[in-house]
């Protein structure tokens, strides 16, 4: 275990999840995909060198999955969006005296414990910021803040460059780590295609849900 480094995972309620995937999957399949991706992420985190895992959610199934993998569940600002949910976890971890927070989204099913370890290994002495960009180099898919409140985070489709600029404005040169698993978040139909084509092939729970969903869409009525 790495003392003081906690994973922080914000999870929206699964009902109505992943609306942008409507052309590919039914509402029920999108909910199943959200749950499968979260479990893929939690499984990787549970095997990584972390002091603990915190999940911020109000979803009953997400709560059940989090507890199954030994995560601490909180609900502060859980319905206020990704940014507010992460900020709430950062405040909690800072108040508890934790050394660092590694925030990871719940929709990166190809993440591995080895990738998480690589992010942790790349961090510099505090104050520091380590960031893994999305594959399009626009989003911030994982951010390691040391200490947890080293700077405010603001997530969205174009958060990567603003996070770099914000760190530098505070005199912190961010460490950038490019990782294919963490870099592939599943939000758009082309992300699904990228997941299905990705090599080496991983038998993720998310891929199984997608394969079944696409097969159902393509089968004759």
Ranges and model annotations:
Residues 1-21:
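N-terminal nucleotide-binding beta1-loop-alpha1 segment
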Residues 34-50:
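A short, N-terminal amphipathic alpha-helix
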Residues 50-72:
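Acidic donor-binding segment of Leloir-type glycosyltransferases
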Residues 67-100:
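Short phosphate-binding loop-to-helix
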Residues 105-109:
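The conserved acidic donor/metal-binding loop of glycosyltransferases
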Residues 111-137:
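Conserved donor-nucleotide/metal-binding helix-loop-beta segment in metal-dependent transferases, i.e.
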Residues 145-167:
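Short, glycine-/small-residue-rich phosphate/pyrophosphate-handling segment
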Residues 166-220:
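Conserved alpha/beta core of the MobA/IspD/sugar-nucleotide pyrophosphorylase nucleotidyltransferase superfamily
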């Amino acid at each position: 275990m790495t003392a003081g480094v906690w994973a922080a995972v914000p999870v929206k309620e699964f009902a109505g999840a992943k609306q942008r995937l409507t052309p590919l999957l039914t509402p029920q399949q999108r909910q199943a995909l959200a749950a499968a991706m979260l479990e893929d992420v939690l499984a990787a985190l549970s095997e990584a060198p972390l002091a603990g895992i915190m999940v911020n959610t109000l979803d009953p199934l997400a709560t059940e999955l989090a507890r199954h993998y030994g995560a601490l569940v909180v609900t502060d600002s859980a319905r206020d969006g990704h940014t507010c949910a992460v900020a709430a976890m950062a405040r909690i971890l800072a108040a508890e005296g934790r050394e660092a927070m590694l925030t990871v989204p719940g929709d990166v099913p190809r993440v591995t414990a080895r990738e998480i370890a690589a992010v942790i290994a790349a961090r510099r002495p505090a104050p520091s910021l380590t960031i893994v960009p999305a594959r399009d180099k626009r989003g911030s898919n994982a951010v390691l803040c040391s200490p947890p409140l080293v700077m405010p985070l603001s997530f969205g489709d174009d958060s990567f460059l603003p996070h770099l600029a914000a760190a530098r404005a505070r005199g912190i040169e961010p460490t950038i780590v490019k990782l294919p698993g963490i870099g592939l978040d599943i939000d758009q139909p082309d992300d699904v295609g990228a997941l299905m084509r990705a090599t080496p092939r991983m038998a993720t729970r998310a891929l199984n849900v997608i394969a079944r969903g696409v097969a159902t869409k393509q089968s004759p009525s």
